[in-house]
Amino acid sequence: MRGGTYVLNFYSAVFVDQLKRGRKTATIRLGDKSNKYERGQVVWITVGFRHSPRQKIFAAVIDEVEVKKVSELSRRDIEHDNPEFRRVEDEVNFLEQIYSRPVSADDVITVIRFSQIVEPPESHFGNGETPSHN
């Protein structure tokens, strides 16, 4: 397991609501990212621009890291990355905007699926009981 803190950052604030509501549970990244992310790894999910302050949305655990070609993307892959998209063409257009370069069906991508880590509510005393106010 890799040490240190890793981040999955999203550049658009549009994703904040989708992330918080659990509608966005994956990210599709251009290239093979399997050397950076692995199943079971804990990461911070953040939003912000490169070289700028970023907002931590939540901590997450990586459920799956799958390297494949763009042409092998499933509808499920696409919908988990962006609930508004249904077609590979939509995803390709999006990737081209993010990476500022053409993306072909033969390009390698990495689908990273993640689940939010929900923090337990703070106990009042440590024994789970609510303090009485007599």
Residue locations for each model-derived region?
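Structured alpha/beta reader/binder surfaces that contact nucleic acids or chromatin modification marks
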Residues: 1-134
